[in-house]
Every structure is written in structure tokens, then in C-alpha cells.
């Protein structure tokens, strides 16, 4: 505690005997200000940890009351070192913030008290109706609350606002209903008034002309609508009547209100802005009239613009609407004279481009282009979709990428000689220029220091008049003004004098390529010899000598080494500072590496990974043939795996090695040909261009940002550069291709790229600000839309008609013709080779079948095996089965069960070889002694587990029962040729070992994690738009924000990996035959490489194993370890276990005690609120009915609005409704339908296609079902289903669930120990160990919060835990306290009928700290709290919490031995 803070506590009478004093005494006063005139004090306090709320309020009250008593005011701000905050503490501080703002902003308090607030993980989420959210909360209140929280130390808390859609909808309907009723009332009153007037007035004489009829009026109205003036949306900023818009519908939502009215909300854009629109329809008949309101249509609309009170934005209430035609851009050139785009990006160019590859190819095909190239930045992730789309569209896709080309090694010394570093004389120089181009910009200062042995022996400093006024940017950057250069020596004289000054010396510059390049360009221009003596680049010297430094610029280096740099960017100061650094480097390179000679710097200091710091240059690479495709895949892989540094880099030597089959283009303004031309002129550019197969030129508009960057003077200079590029190509007889650098399709799409790019922040090179201060802005982005041939010819019209046609059309077509069609995605499945895989699968299958069912096999078994093996072996699937079997077997040997997912349990072969426990045969009896069996094939039982117990008719042994009646067709299709997708649930604890098993079985070079591509999500896109709006002073109405967010969403943002998917490449091929590889999320330290392609793009070509982690196998293993009971011995038809699904008696409690009428709390598959409700409605009594429930709960539109209603109305029972997908096929075959038709109906229904297929096809199925007496309710039920769960998946899950349930009934303490150790997500030890009353009270508290929509996610998780805690306590078991010497790190401990919680259950104590604490106590007893903190790794807050809970007993703060710690 600082003395000042100690004095303050004393003055405000802070009680020193309170526990709060021990917490607050770590504080200090950082600063204090006194405003005497106002008698106001302002403190800045600092604390190590966030104060507990009790301590904070005590301090706050005493501070204010003390100053109030002196007639003074006090305010303060708190800084906290460790801002770790638990749930309850954050809630307390949030309430404090509301109370603070209550007096000055009462509306905040009243508003927040009626809104849903969720608090968790240092974040606060406010749920509010849309009309409050957009204006009041976000703009006014959130910032105020954040300020209060920041002042008390919670500067890291994020506050977000989420729309409460249910509340928004209710309010909006109420508003509209009220508005309609008011309108109807007004109309009624008007009619009554009119009728009264008519009745009281004399009847007028008949008119000579006839009154217009309704049809005439309507036609006039339509005519006026058709001829009405169209208003641009951007011009409408207030309420107006009878406005007419034309635009594109980009979003439609339709819903029916409680009163039966239909509201159509849709959004329209004319690309100047967007509007939300609304049309109310009285019923479904009227709805037909508005069929044109569909996403993608162009419409003309007329209506009234009103301010919507819910969204607080202008909305059009539509009166008239009609669909209109819209003519998209077309390519106007004749057939055969259309260009090929060779430089186009898709949304797979990370955070840089907008169109999907499908949109790009569709546009090219629509325009009649013969081909189009894909050149995303450094990746080929759009290739698979582009390949399939091009085939479908009938257009050639040219596959390429825009690579980041780097030099292999960047030298430190140019023109090196054999010189001793310490003996040489150096001229350390720097130049200042009007820009970065040695061709287009001028020298304005040359300064140098001649140095020998660390001393300056002579200096050179001359300004140069460029002959024109310096730009404000140049002056701002360099500090050089027109007055500096006015009257300076002529350039040629300065150059000559400088050459004389440099004679006999080694030249030195920081980033020497720039300075030397500028000097040589000017020497050449004036016929002077170019630099030939050695040149040291101190930038590269520093990069190689100090690779651990992140920054090697002149500023950071001078600061690090304490070298003065008073005026950075004035040449004389920069040169002297560079010289001082040089001699530090010479000293360090000798001390670190023993290097003394100039030549050694390149040969011994330049590292092999100097490419990491090398400047990246773009080059476009194109696949010319199949060899080129594989080589490109290798290059992409190497750039991501071996040469990744910030971006994926390709060293030139690597490109040379794999260049076969690849065409190399010179790329854009970031390519080295363009850069050399700009910086050094045509001659040097010709030398560089020799490396490339063709030269790219782009429309002048693409290069326009270079003007803003002061790299090029004007548009005329751009046109000259393009002509110079053509000259470079002509000298080398290389073709010139005009390319568009496409980043979006249409000109109006530019805003989408603008938003995406600006979201990268100023740290991104493309967003580097031009200028300084408030006016600094990034350079504008180029106009990079996809241009038609005629648009491209217009861009290059300045070259003349013939030359423009040559580079735009003729050369691009000729280059496209040189490129062969390639196969990007293979047609077939290529599985790995395992010796004798087919024989092994067949042998294992029959061996197990003989063991269980006897030899010879029953016909039904024999035929099923023969059928399955014919498919599995005939289609090359044996290796997939065998690999899965090997993985499952290895996990079993480690002591874990493995659960199957999906439909693999439909395969009897999979059952026999041990991949799945699910037996798909019809229900049957099986004798474990003599192998006799009896099969029930009439459909009377849905599961063999439900068969009544029975003794073997042959030997009298009690039969085993099995069989779930699942057809094989549901796994591999009716013809058995569908690639098997075997998903397996391994224990989460064993999952890493299972992953490594794949490597072990197939080889590390053949096993890769399944890659994923992360794109900009909808909510993120919305945030990008709002951020752009804020940062660039824009204003968009809500509909326009939504439109822009939709345009931005879907752009690639990062890469990742599937949580359990592993792709296996066949060992007779290599991975580059299918995909490049990389590390997930560009993390080169990751343990696994991933497929570069999204794994879904190649999942039909290679084996993919889903090795997922799951809690069920972990929990089963825990229960087995606790009890010694083999889970495989647990019967699936235990009568006591089945009682859980119909009541609570088997647990020894009443429904009132545990708050639910069944005993399924905490049982996998059945313990959620939703499924518990289903259980309570249906009371299942058989395994088959549990399968039904599992299917019903996982399906979409299978239970709600479907089976639930059928059961309630008594039309069907739980047993007869459609539950799992396989049941449809089995039921229909039992009914008499042809198996093929039964299978097809099942497939149509399970995928939600029943109502989407043609009416003719559907009626054929209905007729067949009715002919076989399938009831109408069953047929109608099929039509409602959107998705169905596989029965095999349900069976695997239910079998696991019943094993867990067995322990809950028969070995409850083991069950609760396992549940809390593995499944529980949240704990509150104080409540859990305080007894039943405390638990029930806390549950009631959370229930009330839930009703007010105020319960946090953590509280919702805690409620689930407390339900099980309550049940456990009601059954007579208890929770003990944490015990410093008994508690485990992560798992609960059984002590009689009591569970001792682990350390991890203590709020704020993580797994690593818990393990450290357990390890520390093994070393010896903790003698003091200080020792506990140090050895156990606990924070002061955690130690205090343990102390408050009574866990530390009378442990002293310090022990005597600790007094001597500081001496060691």
C-alpha cells in the first residue's frame, strides 16, 4: 500500500479490522487533481485485482461521505491490473452502474428493468425490441453504462445489444392492428357522416354525363402508376406520400398474425440506397395477387413513406406494386470477338473480393466469353466449385492464383568485396524525394556522413530544386519546404560532387535498394557511371543480425540502441543515425558470430529464412495442364507449410522447381515488372520481365490509386506506363494481356469491397493512410468490376483500335487456347490400400457371425451378410470398414466404448466386425450356448430388446435378445454403391489418441485433418457495415445496412479444421493428387496439417473418418472404473430402468420433490426440457418407443405440429407414428409396397422433398400407399417432415443412455459422481453444500429470472446442475466441502454417501491451476496462505474465497520461514 493511499484510508475512517481492509490495502494513488475553485477532487486509484462489490461500496460510501462533510466533491477512476471477474461480481457492478445513472438518466433505469439482460464472461448482452435497440440503447445508453463500468475498473467489459425478435413482432402486430382499427373506425365515421348528409339534402337533378365506373378508375390509376416519376431512394429522407421507387428485392419475410392477417415485409434497393417495405394482406387468397414479391425480382412500387415506430426508420407502406423487367449488362461484341478475363478474384481471396466463383463463371458465360480465369490471393479454395460450375455452364475455367513471390535470399551487401569491416571507410547516405518512383519523381536532398572507425570524418548535404513546388505531402513527410530547395545547385552538379565524395568508400543506406535505385536512375539520366562500389543495406543487416526484433525500421532501431534521430525523413539526420547504427552492428556481428569481413555478411550471416522478411511481389500462376495442376497444389502447400510468414510465400527457387505445366504472368501494380518499370525505367523492367511468360496490363482506372499515393502524377502518366509495359513485352516478344483485376461483378458492388477492405483496419497495407493528422485517409480503391469486352476496349482506346483489340481480345483468346482442360476434382473414390482388406473384413464378419449364430448360419443372416459384402467388397469399401474397425478396436483396448453415429448401425457387417453395437437384423432371440436363433419378421416388435424373456427351445438356456430391424439400404443406398460415411463417437478423453491412431495406421504423410474455410458471418458483416459507417462518416438507413451486410457476408476470413474429421489419402498416390495442404488458421505450430480445400469438396474422392469426441463414452468409462461393472453386461430391458420414463418411484422420491413427473433428469438423450416434455406426454415403456422418441426429438417437423398432434387426438400412438427415417421403409414394405418404392419414399420424406417433387410423382406414391391400406394420416404426416433422424443413430444413443440410467437407478452415488465430473457445466459450491433449502431457493431465484428473461447463460447452466443436485439430496446423498487435502483437480470424490467436489468446481479456478494445486500438495503441507499462493498458483482472490468458505481453517497469512524468502 502506498503511503498516500494509506493516509487516505485513515482520513475516510476505513475500518482496519474488517476483512475488506486486507483486500483494499493493495491499492495506491496513481494521481490526484484538485480544482480549488470548484472544491472538487479527482483521484486515479490502482488495485491489483478488481475489488469485491462489498469492499468497493464500503470504500465508495466512506469516500463520498468524508468529502461531503468538508463541503467538497470527489470523483475517481480505478485502474485494475488483473481484470478477472466472475458472474456475480459483474452483475453487482452492472446494477451499481444503473443506480448511478438513475438520478441523471431515469429512463435508463426504467428501460433496463424491463429488458432481458444476459451477463457472462466479461460481456453483457441486452435483449430489446428493434425500435428501442437501434436508437435509444445503442446510441445513448450503452456508452453511458460502459463509462461507469470503466471508471470502477471494468474497462474490458463488452456490451452488446441483441434484438428480441419475439417482443419486436408482438409490438409491431399490436401497432399495425391498432392502426388498422383506427383507419376502419375513421372510414366508418366518414360513411355515417356521408349517409347523414345525403339523407338531409335534396336529391339533385340527374347529371348529363355518366359517372365513371370502377374499372375506368382502376385503369386510370394503373396508367398513372406506370407513368409516374421514379424517385431515387437516396433522395427520400422524410415522410412522404405516393412515392414511386424501382428496385431489386433482396429480402422477403412473410408471416401470419394471430388474427389470420398476413404481413409481407420485404426490402428493395435501387443501389443508391434501400428501403424496407410492408404490405398487409387479409388472407391467403389475396396473397396470390402479390406473388411478384420474391427475392431476386425487380419491381416498381408506390406507397407512403412513414417513420416506423419500431425500427425508427423510414418504411414504405406499399399501395401498388408490379414486376418489371431489368436488363443486366451485356457484352456487345459479336460472337468470336469476346475477351477472356485472366485476373479475377472470388470471395475466397481473404477479405478482399466479393463474388462467389459461381457468380463469376455465370457472368462470363452469360456474356458469351469462351473462358475465365480464377486467380485468388495465394489460395485455390474456389477451384472445386469453379470446376463443377464451369462444366455445368459450358465454359472453360482457367485455374490459377495470384502468388506472393519472394527472393530466396536477400543480400546484405551488393557488389561485395574482400574488405575488413573495422578498417573500411563508409559513406552512409540517405536521399529525400518527391515520391517513390525514380522514374516519375525527383531527388530533393542528398546527405551523407563519411565515417571511419566509428567517427564522422566528413559530411555531405545538398538540397536539389525539382523545378516545381513541393506537394504538401512531401513537405509534411520530410520537413523540406520550397524555401529549402530554392536556389539550390543543379542536380547534375550535386550528383557529380556526390560521386567524388563517395570514391574509395563502402556505401551504406537503410533500405538501400530504394536509395541506390534512385541514385542510379539519376546517374543514368545524366550519363554518369552507376554505383559499382560495395553497398551495405543496414535494413537487411539488422534483420539478419537481430531476427528476434519485430521491427527493423530506422525509427525503432535508433530508439532501441539509444541513437539520436531528431528529424526522421530529413536526409542529413537519417544518414548520421544510420552511420551510428552501422558501427553498433559491426561490433555486434563480431561478438555474436565472429564475422570481420564484408564478404562474410552475405555468405555467413544471411539466413536461409531471410525470405520471411523479403518484400512480397505478386505474380499470377496458371495451370496449363494436369502436371501444372499438381505442381500448383505443391506450390500452394509449400507456401503455406514451409514458407509461411504473415502470408503464404513462394520463393523464386521453389517456383522454378515446380514451374512445369504452369504459365507465369506479371500480375498487377504489386508485381515486380510494374514496380521495376515505375522505379527504374524500361531497361531494368525488361531484365525483370524475362522471367515471365506474358505481361499484364490493366485499365487506367485500376492504376488510379497510384496518383493519390503520389507514385504517378496524373492519368497521362498512367497511360504512358501502360504503353511502356507494352514496350517491355515487345522487346522480349512476349504477349501482352489486358486483364481487369476483378474483385466484384458490377460497378455498384464496389461498396461491398470497400467495407470488407476497410474492416481490416489501418494496419493493413491497403489501408495505410496518406498524409498525417485528421485528414489522413487511405488511398481510394480502384474500380475493379468485371468488364465486358466493349468496356475493356473503351478503357484502352488511347492505344488505338488495333492494339486495343490485340491485347483485349486476340491475345487473351490465344492464351486461353494454350491451356488444356484439367480434372480438378476426381470422379471416383480412392481409398487407401490395406493388405487383404477385403479378405479381413469377410473373415472377421463370418467368424463373428459363426460365433454368435452358428455354422451353418441361418438363411436370414447368411443372405444379409452376402448382400452387404457384395456391395462393400464390390465397390471398394472394405478398407473403410477395416480402418474403422481398427480404430474402434484400439480405443476398446484402451478401455473405452465407442458409440456409432449416423446410419452405420444399418450395416450388419459393421456390427459383426465391431464398428457398432447396433444390430440391424429383425428382432430375434439368440442362444448364447448353442447359437439357436428365432427371428420375428412380421413387424410386431420394433426392437429385439422388447421381446419377452424366453428360454432356448433347443437347450433351455435363456435367450439373448437383439435386433432393431434396420434395412441396409439406409446406409449405402438402394444399390449399395453410396460412399459409406462412418461417424464414430470416441470418448473426449481418448479422441486425441484415436486421431494419432489414424496416422499410425496410414502414415503421417497420408493423414490430414479435414480443413474448413471460415467466412464472414451475417452478424460480423453487420458489424463491418456499422464500423465503416462510423469510421468514414456515412449514414445508412437500416434496410441499406442489411443490404450491404448481405453483400459482405460469405467472404473468406480464415481457415480452420473439422473437430473430428480426418482425411486419409490412398498410399499409392499423394495428397497433391487431390488437394494442397496447409496449417489450420495459418498456425504453423499446429500439430496437424489440414486439407487446403474444404473437406466437403473432396469427400467423395478420399476416405474421411469422423473421429468425434463425446461425453457418453467418457461417462461410461468413469462409471465402469467406479463400479467395476462391464457396461456391455447391462441389459437394455432392465424393468426398473424403464420405470424412469413413467414416474419417479424407482428413485424413491416424489415428483414434487424433484420438480418433474419422471426420473429422466440427467439421462443422455432424454434429460433436456424438450425431451422431458415428450416423455411426460407419451410415457414410453419399451426400447422401440424410446427409439421413436429419439427420432422425434432430433427430427424437424416430425414431432411438433405432426406426431404430437396425432398422439393427442388419439389418431396414432407413440409406437405407430413416424419416428425415424428407416421406419418408413420398413413400415411400407410390411404394408406390401415394393422395396425400391418404399426406399424412394423414405428418401423423399427424410430430406423434406415430399412437397417439392412433382405432383405426378407424389400422386404415384400416394396411390401405391393407399392401395396397400396405408392410412391417410400417415401420408399427410410424410408431407410435413423436413428432416429425419436415422434409426441406427437413435439406437446407439439410446443404448448408451440406458447404461447411464442403469447406474442412476442401481448405483446412484456412482452416477452422481460421474455426472458432476463429466457433464455438469456450472457449479455454485456455496449453494450445493448448503443443503436442500438453499438449493431449492436458488432454483426458484433462477426460475423467476427466467420468467423475466433475466437469467444469464451461466445461471441456465447452473439450474441444470442444481436439478441434479436437488435430486441427489432428495435421495439421501450429500455434498461435502472442498477439502484442501482430499479434493481432486477435476473429478468429484466419493466418500460414503457424500461427494467431495474438485477444485475446478470453485468459481474462477481453472483446470491448470487445479492440477498445479494438487501437484503442490503432494510436495508437502501448506503452512501459510502466502505459501499456498506461491506453490499452489492461486490468486489472492481465490485464497480469500477458500478462506471465506472455511476450507483453510486457521491457516496463518505467513509462516516464519517465508520471512527469509527475499534472501534467496
Curated annotation (Swiss-Prot):
GO terms for molecular function: 3'-5' exonuclease activity; DNA binding; DNA-directed DNA polymerase activity. GO terms for biological process: DNA-templated DNA replication. InterPro entries: DNA_pol3_alpha_NTPase_dom, DNA_pol3_finger, DNA_PolC-like_N_II, DNA_PolC-type_N_I, DnaE2/DnaE/PolC, DNAPol_HHH, DnaQ, Exonuclease_RNaseT/DNA_pol3. It is found in: Cytoplasm. Keywords: Cytoplasm, DNA replication, DNA-directed DNA polymerase, Exonuclease, Hydrolase, Nuclease, Nucleotidyltransferase, Transferase. Residues 426-582 form the Exonuclease domain. Its EC number is 2.7.7.7. Its main location: cytoplasm. It catalyses: DNA(n) + a 2'-deoxyribonucleoside 5'-triphosphate = DNA(n+1) + diphosphate. One of its GO terms (cellular component) is cytoplasm. It comes from the Bacteria. Pfam families: DNA_pol3_a_NI (PF14480), DNA_pol3_a_NII (PF11490), DNA_pol3_alpha (PF07733), DNA_pol3_finger (PF17657), HHH_6 (PF14579), PHP (PF02811), RNase_T (PF00929). Required for replicative DNA synthesis. This DNA polymerase also exhibits 3' to 5' exonuclease activity. Belongs to the DNA polymerase type-C family. PolC subfamily. This is DNA polymerase III PolC-type. It comes from Streptococcus thermophilus (strain ATCC BAA-491 / LMD-9). The gene is polC.
Amino acid at each position: 500500500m502506498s503511503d498516500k493511499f494509506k493516509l487516505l484510508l485513515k482520513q475516510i475512517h476505513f475500518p482496519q479490522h474488517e476483512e475488506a481492509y486486507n483486500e483494499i490495502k493493495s491499492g495506491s494513488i496513481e494521481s490526484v487533481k484538485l480544482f480549488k475553485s470548484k472544491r472538487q477532487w479527482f483521484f486515479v486509484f490502482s488495485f491489483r485485482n478488481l475489488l469485491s462489490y462489498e469492499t468497493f461500496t464500503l470504500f465508495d460510501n466512506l469516500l463520498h461521505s468524508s468529502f461531503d462533510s468538508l463541503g467538497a466533491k470527489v470523483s475517481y477512476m480505478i485502474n485494475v491490473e488483473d481484470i478477472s471477474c466472475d458472474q456475480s461480481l459483474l452483475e453487482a457492478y452492472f446494477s451499481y452502474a444503473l443506480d448511478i445513472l438513475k438520478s441523471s438518466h431515469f429512463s435508463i433505469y426504467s428501460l433496463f428493468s424491463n429488458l432481458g439482460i444476459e451477463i457472462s464472461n466479461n460481456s453483457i448482452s441486452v435483449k430489446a425490441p428493434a425500435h428501442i435497440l437501434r436508437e435509444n440503447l445503442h446510441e445513448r445508453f450503452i456508452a453511458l453504462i460502459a463509462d461507469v463500468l470503466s471508471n470502477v475498473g471494468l474497462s474490458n467489459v463488452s456490451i452488446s445489444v441483441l434484438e428480441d425478435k419475439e417482443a419486436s413482432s408482438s409490438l409491431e402486430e399490436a401497432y399495425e392492428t391498432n392502426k388498422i382499427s383506427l383507419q376502419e373506425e375513421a372510414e366508418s365515421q366518414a360513411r355515417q357522416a356521408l349517409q347523414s348528409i345525403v339523407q338531409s339534402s335534396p336529391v339533385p337533378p340527374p347529371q348529363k354525363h355518366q359517372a365513371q365506373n370502377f374499372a375506368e378508375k382502376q385503369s386510370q390509376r394503373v396508367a398513372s402508376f406506370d407513368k409516374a416519376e421514379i424517385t431515387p431512394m437516396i433522395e427520400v429522407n422524410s415522410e412522404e406520400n405516393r412515392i414511386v421507387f424501382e428496385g431489386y428485392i433482396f429480402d422477403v419475410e412473410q408471416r401470419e398474425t394471430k388474427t389470420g392477417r398476413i404481413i409481407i415485409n420485404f426490402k428493395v434497393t435501387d443501389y443508391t440506397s434501400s428501403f424496407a417495405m410492408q404490405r398487409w394482406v387479409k388472407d391467403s387468397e389475396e396473397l396470390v395477387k402479390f406473388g411478384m414479391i420474391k427475392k431476386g425480382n425487380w419491381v416498381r412500387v408506390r406507397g407512403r413513406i412513414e417513420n416506423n415506430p419500431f425500427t425508427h426508420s423510414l418504411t414504405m407502406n406499399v399501395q401498388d406494386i408490379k414486376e418489371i423487367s431489368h436488363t443486366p449488362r451485356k457484352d456487345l461484341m459479336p460472337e468470336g470477338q469476346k475477351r477472356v478475363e485472366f485476373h479475377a478474384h472470388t470471395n475466397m481471396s481473404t477479405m478482399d473480393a466479393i463474388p462467389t466463383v459461381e457468380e463469376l463463371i455465370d457472368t462470363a458465360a452469360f456474356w458469351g466469353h469462351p473462358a475465365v480465369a480464377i486467380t485468388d490471393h495465394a489460395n485455390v479454395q474456389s477451384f472445386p466449385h469453379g470446376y463443377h460450375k464451369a462444366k455445368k455452364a459450358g465454359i472453360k475455367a482457367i485455374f490459377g492464383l495470384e502468388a506472393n513471390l519472394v527472393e530466396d535470399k536477400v543480400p546484405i551487401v551488393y557488389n561485395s568485396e574482400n574488405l575488413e569491416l573495422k578498417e573500411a571507410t563508409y559513406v552512409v547516405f540517405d536521399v529525400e524525394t518527391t515520391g517513390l518512383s525514380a522514374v516519375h519523381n525527383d531527388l530533393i536532398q542528398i546527405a551523407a556522413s563519411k565515417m571511419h572507425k566509428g567517427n564522422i570524418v566528413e559530411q555531405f548535404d545538398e538540397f536539389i530544386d525539382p523545378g516545381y513546388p513541393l506537394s504538401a505531402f512531401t513537405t509534411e513527410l520530410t520537413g523540406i519546404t520550397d524555401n529549402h530547395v530554392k536556389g539550390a545547385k543543379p542536380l547534375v552538379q550535386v550528383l557529380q560532387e556526390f560521386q567524388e565524395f563517395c570514391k574509395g568508400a563502402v556505401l551504406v543506406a537503410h533500405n538501400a535498394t530504394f536509395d541506390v535505385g534512385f541514385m542510379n536512375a539519376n546517374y543514368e539520366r545524366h550519363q554518369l557511371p552507376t554505383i559499382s562500389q560495395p553497398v551495405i543495406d543496414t535494413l537487411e543487416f539488422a534483420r539478419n543480425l537481430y531476427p528476434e526484433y519485430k521491427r527493423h525500421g530506422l525509427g525503432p532501431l535508433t530508439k532501441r540502441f539509444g541513437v539520436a534521430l531528431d528529424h526522421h525523413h530529413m536526409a542529413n539526420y537519417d544518414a548520421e543515425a544510420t552511420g551510428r547504427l552501422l558501427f553498433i552492428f559491426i561490433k555486434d556481428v563480431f561478438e555474436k558470430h565472429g564475422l570481420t569481413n564484408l564478404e562474410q555478411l552475405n555468405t555467413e550471416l544471411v539466413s536461409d529464412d531471410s525470405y520471411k522478411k523479403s518484400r512480397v511481389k505478386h505474380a499470377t500462376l496458371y495451370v496449363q495442364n494436369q502436371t501444372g495442376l499438381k505442381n500448383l497444389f505443391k506450390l500452394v502447400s509449400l507456401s503455406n507449410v514451409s514458407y509461411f510468414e504473415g502470408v503464404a510465400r513462394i520463393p523464386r527457387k521453389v517456383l522454378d522447381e515446380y514451374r512445369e505445366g504452369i504459365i507465369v504472368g506479371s500480375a498487377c501494380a504489386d508485381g515486380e515488372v510494374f514496380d521495376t518499370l515505375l522505379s527504374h525505367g524500361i531497361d531494368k523492367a525488361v531484365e525483370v520481365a524475362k522471367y515471365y511468360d506474358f505481361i499484364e496490363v490493366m485499365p487506367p482506372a485500376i492504376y488510379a490509386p497510384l496518383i493519390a499515393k503520389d507514385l504517378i502524377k496524373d492519368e497521362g502518366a498512367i497511360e504512358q506506363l501502360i504503353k511502356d509495359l507494352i514496350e517491355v513485352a515487345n522487346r522480349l516478344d512476349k504477349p501482352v494481356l489486358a486483364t481487369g483485376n476483378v474483385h466484384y461483378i458490377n460497378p455498384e458492388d464496389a461498396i461491398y469491397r470497400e467495407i470488407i477492405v476497410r474492416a481490416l483496419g489501418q494496419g493493413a497495407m491497403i489501408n495505410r493512410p496518406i498524409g498525417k493528422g485528421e485528414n489522413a485517409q487511405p488511398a481510394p480503391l480502384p474500380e475493379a468490376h468485371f468488364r465486358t469486352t466493349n468496356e475493356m476496349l473503351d478503357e484502352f482506346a488511347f492505344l488505338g483500335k488495333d492494339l486495343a483489340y490485340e491485347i483485349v481480345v486476340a491475345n487473351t483468346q490465344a492464351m486461353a487456347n494454350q491451356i488444356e482442360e484439367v480434372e480438378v476434382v476426381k470422379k471416383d473414390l480412392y481409398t487407401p490400400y490395406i493388405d487383404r482388406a477385403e479378405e479381413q473384413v469377410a473373415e472377421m464378419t463370418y467368424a463373428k457371425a459363426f460365433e454368435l449364430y452358428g455354422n451353418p448360419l441361418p438363411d436370414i443372416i447368411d443372405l444379409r451378410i452376402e448382400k452387404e459384402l457384395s456391395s462393400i467388397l464390390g465397390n471398394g469399401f472394405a478398407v473403410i470398414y477395416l480402418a474403422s474397425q481398427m480404430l474402434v478396436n484400439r480405443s476398446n483396448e484402451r478401455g473405452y466404448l465407442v458409440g456409432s453415429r449416423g446410419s452405420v448401425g444399418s450395416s450388419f457387417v459393421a456390427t459383426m466386425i465391431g464398428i457398432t453395437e447396433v444390430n440391424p437384423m429383425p428382432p430375434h432371440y439368440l442362444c448364447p450356448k448353442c447359437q439357436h436363433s428365432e427371428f420375428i419378421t412380421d413387424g410386431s416388435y420394433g426392437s429385439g430388446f422388447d421381446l419377452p424373456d424366453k428360454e432356448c427351445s433347443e437347450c433351455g438356456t435363456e435367450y439373448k435378445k437383439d435386433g432393431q430391424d434396420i434395412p441396409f439400404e439406409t446406409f449405402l443406398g438402394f444399390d449399395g454403391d453410396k460412399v459409406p460415411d462412418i461417424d464414430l463417437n470416441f470418448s473426449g478423453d481418448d479422441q486425441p489418441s484415436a486421431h494419432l491412431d489414424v496416422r499410425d495406421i496410414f502414415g503421417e504423410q497420408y493423414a490430414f485433418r479435414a480443413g474448413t474455410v471460415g467466412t464472414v458471418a451475417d452478424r460480423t458483416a453487420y458489424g463491418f457495415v456499422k464500423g465503416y459507417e462510423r469510421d468514414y462518416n456515412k449514414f445508412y438507413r437500416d434496410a441499406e445496412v442489411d443490404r450491404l451486410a448481405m453483400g459482405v457476408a460469405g467472404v473468406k476470413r480464415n481457415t480452420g479444421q473439422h473437430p473430428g474429421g480426418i482425411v486419409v489419402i490412398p498410399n499409392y498416390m499423394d495428397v497433391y493428387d487431390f488437394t494442397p495442404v496447409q496449417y489450420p488458421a495459418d498456425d504453423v505450430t499446429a500439430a496437424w496439417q489440414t486439407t487446403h480445400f474444404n473437406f466437403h469438396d473432396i469427400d467423395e474422392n478420399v476416405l474421411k473418418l469422423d473421429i468425434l469426441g463425446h461425453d457418453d463414452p467418457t461417462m461410461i468409462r468413469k462409471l465402469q472404473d467406479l463400479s467395476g461393472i462391464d457396461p456391455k453386461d447391462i441389459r437394455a430391458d432392465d424393468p426398473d430402468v424403464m420405470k424412469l420414463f413413467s414416474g419417479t418411484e424407482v428413485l424413491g422420491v416424489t415428483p414434487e420433490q424433484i420438480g418433474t413427473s419422471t426420473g429422466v433428469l440427467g439421462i443422455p438423450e432424454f434429460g433436456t426440457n424438450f425431451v422431458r416434455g415428450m416423455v411426460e406426454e407419451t410415457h414410453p415403456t419399451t426400447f422401440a418407443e424410446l427409439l421413436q422418441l429419439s427420432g422425434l426429438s432430433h427430427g424437424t417437423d416430425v414431432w411438433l405440429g405432426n406426431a404430437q398432434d396425432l398422439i393427442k387426438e388419439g389418431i396414432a400412438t407413440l409406437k405407430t407414428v413416424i419416428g425415424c427415417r428407416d421406419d418408413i421403409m420398413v413400415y411400407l414394405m410390411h404394408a406390401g409396397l415394393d422395396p425400391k418404392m418404399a426406399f424412394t419414399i423414405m428418401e423423399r420424406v427424410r430430406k423434406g422433398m415430399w412437397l417439392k417433387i412433382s405432383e405426378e410423382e407424389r400422386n404415384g406414391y400416394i396411390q401405391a400407399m393407399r392401395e396397400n391400406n396405408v392410412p391417410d394420416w400417415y401420408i399427410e404426416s410424410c408431407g410435413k417432415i423436413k428432416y429425419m433422424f436415422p434409426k441406427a443413430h437413435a439406437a446407439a444413443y439410446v443404448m448408451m443412455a440406458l447404461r447411464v440410467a442403469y447406474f442412476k437407478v442401481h448405483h446412484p452415488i456412482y452416477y452422481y459422481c460421474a455426472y458432476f465430473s463429466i457433464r455438469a457445466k456450472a457449479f455454485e459450491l456455496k449453494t450445493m453444500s448448503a443443503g436442500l433449502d438453499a438449493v431449492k431457493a436458488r432454483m426458484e431465484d433462477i426460475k423467476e429470472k427466467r420468467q423475466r428473461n433475466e437469467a444469464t447463460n451461466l445461471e441456465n447452466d447452473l439450474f441444470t446442475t442444481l436439478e441434479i443436485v436437488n435430486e441427489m439430496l432428495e435421495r439421501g446423498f450429500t455434498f461435502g466441502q472442498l477439502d484442501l487435502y482430499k479434493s481432486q483437480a477435476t473429478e468429484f470424490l466419493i466418500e460414503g454417501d457424500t461427494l467431495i467436489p474438485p477444485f475446478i468446481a470453485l468459481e474462477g479456478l481453472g483446470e491448470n491451476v487445479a492440477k498445479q494445486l494438487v501437484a503442490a500438495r503432494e510436495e508437502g503441507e501448506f503452512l501459510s496462505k502466502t505459501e499456498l499462493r506461491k506453490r499452489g498458483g492461486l490468486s489472492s482472490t481465490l485464497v480469500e474465497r477458500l478462506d471465506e468458505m472455511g476450507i483453510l481453517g486457521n491457516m496463518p497469512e505467513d509462516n516464519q520461514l517465508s520471512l527469509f524468502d527475499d534472501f534467496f
